[in-house]
Amino acid sequence: LHCHWRTPGFEYKEDIETGSRAAAAGGYTFVNLMPNTKPVCSSAAQAMMVEQKAAEMGLCDVNQTVSITENFDGVSIDHLKTLPAGVKFITEDGHGVQDNATMAKAFAICTQKDITVMSHAEDMEISPWDYRLAEDIETVRNCWLSEYYQTKLHMCHVSTRGALDAIQMAKLRGAPVTCEVTPHHLWFTNDTCDYRVNPPIRTADDVQALIDAIR
């Protein structure tokens, strides 16, 4: 659900051929690509171009996501209103949408169009001084929006007990929320690993909560 092939614009990091071959070698038959390309994938036309090139490779099925806000500008969502039925997911990839009204309007549009919102939860005003609160507070907001609008929401790389609790409570209230966790957030703790990722490596308590949720 969460891959970065970087076509167009950043092919020196990964391109459609290398990504397709890696997916096939790992046994993956479907991959979902993030829109952090250059230009940012903010249209169905650009998404279809990437998907067509991947289809020509013929090694795996590909879906190209579209950005929540146009060019990741944080506010413009008019492009969402014209997305065709083939678009399945929107995401701001490694950014949280900071403006509450913008995100609420995006959720409302996605409910009408049956599009799933994929969310990197990070309040950028808070993250400079508290990464944990930054993830937790935006997870709570997005779960409430999912419940209110009944918008399908997928929370990316959940890493804290608080965020997980918010997701579980939202699901109990009937919100259509799913989530994922990365291997490194299940394996490492911040007292044994000085490795910089976003979201950060968390505490042993967070790791145990994530493992328990999988079980």
Which residues make up each language-model segment?
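Alpha-helix-loop-beta-strand connector modules within alpha/beta enzyme cores
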Residues: 44-65, 108-119
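Structured loop/turn residues at beta-strand edges in well-structured enzyme cores
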Residues: 26, 60, 85
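Short, composition-biased local secondary-structure segments
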Residues: 45-58, 71-81, 135-140
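Short beta-strand segments at enzyme active-site cores
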Residues: 30-34, 63, 118-120, 154-155
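Histidine/acidic residue-rich metal-binding segments in metalloenzymes
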Residues: 77-215
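Active-site mouth loops of central-metabolism enzymes
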Residues: 1-14, 37, 63-75, 94, ...
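Metal-associated gating/positioning segment near the N- to mid-region
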Residues: 1-57
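Glycine-/small-residue-rich active-site loops that bind phosphorylated ligands and cofactors
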Residues: 11, 38-42, 71, 97-98, ...
